[in-house]
């Protein structure tokens, strides 16, 4: 496999798999993607929060939304952990789809080609965060890359994919004690539940996610008007990082409050309850209208 080969991206392959991705996007994950502004021509750095352990279903939704809007002719790459490239079937698919091993050099080379580049700065730590932290946005290195290459940043926030499993802990302490960071570049050893394995004990194998609805917002491009040398100033890097993360947190809070994500989105629950009541009503025997003072519960609601 070629996790560092930019020429392995195959436009024809991407065109061939789009129909399958459309089914996952529309029918399985019921993806909803909001675009605040068009993606500018030329190189751009998409910076996204990471969800769903190594299965990362939201990543596929981001890719499909981009291909639909701009077609596979527009060059795009995604930076990811290099371990999946060693999986025989997955490695070839990832290469052809435009995946590259996540490191600053690959990001630089892709941007120099004028590509749109998707990065998940939180890496495996963000992807394996505990369920309670599923709306959290974290980490930094993308700022220096954007400043050095003089490209705009388009933040991407997504909710729903991390509800496809339940992790109690990311197991960072366990990973350090076992030396997983040195052996496999893995900073986590998550513990929780995921289908089809049931209990997840330290090894973040890709899981089979249930059909959770994924709600994504791609924010407008952020430009900072700073020279490349600003990438070497820790104070400036921190300021840029803070502005990006605050924009992402604001958008994430809005998406969270909208409630249009998850296995049964909050915005859909009333309709689901109505359908369930209708279905159950057809199965239950008809009651005498005078039999109970609570026979008008449909009008008054369930206590």
PLM features per residue range, with description:
Residues 1-106, 171, 254-303:
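Membrane-anchoring hydrophobic helices of lipid-metabolizing enzymes
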Residues 1-17, 109-303:
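Non-catalytic C-terminal accessory region of glycerolipid acyltransferases
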């Amino acid at each position: 496999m070629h996790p560092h080969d930019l020429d392995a991206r195959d436009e024809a392959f991407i065109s061939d798999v789009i129909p399958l991705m459309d089914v996952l996007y529309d029918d399985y994950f019921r993806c909803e993607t909001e675009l605040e502004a068009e993606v500018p021509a030329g190189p751009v750095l998409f910076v996204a929060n990471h969800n769903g352990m190594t299965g990362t279903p939201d990543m596929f939704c981001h890719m499909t939304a981009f291909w639909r809007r701009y077609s596979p002719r527009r060059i795009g790459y995604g930076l990811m952990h290099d371990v999946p490239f060693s999986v025989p079937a997955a490695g070839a698919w990832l290469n052809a789809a435009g995946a590259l091993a996540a490191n600053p050099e690959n990001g630089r080379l892709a941007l120099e080609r004028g590509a749109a580049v998707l990065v998940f700065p939180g890496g495996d730590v963000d992807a394996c965060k505990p369920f309670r932290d599923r709306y959290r946005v974290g980490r930094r290195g993308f700022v220096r890359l954007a400043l050095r290459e003089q490209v705009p940043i388009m933040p991407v926030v997504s909710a729903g994919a991390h509800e496809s499993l339940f992790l109690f802990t990311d197991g960072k302490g366990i990973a350090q004690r076992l030396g997983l960071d040195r052996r496999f570049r893995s900073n986590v050893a998550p513990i929780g539940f995921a289908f089809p394995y049931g209990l997840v004990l330290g090894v973040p194998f890709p899981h089979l996610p249930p059909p959770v609805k994924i709600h994504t917002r791609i924010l407008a491009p952020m430009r900072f008007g700073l020279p490349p040398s600003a990438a070497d100033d820790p104070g400036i890097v921190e300021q840029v990082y803070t502005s990006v993360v605050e924009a992402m947190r604001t958008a994430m809070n809005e998406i969270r409050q909208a409630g249009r994500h998850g296995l049964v989105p909050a915005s859909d629950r009333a309709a689901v309850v109505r359908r369930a009541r209708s279905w159950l009503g057809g199965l239950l025997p008809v009651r005498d209208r005078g039999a109970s003072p609570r026979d008008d519960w449909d009008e008054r609601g369930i206590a």
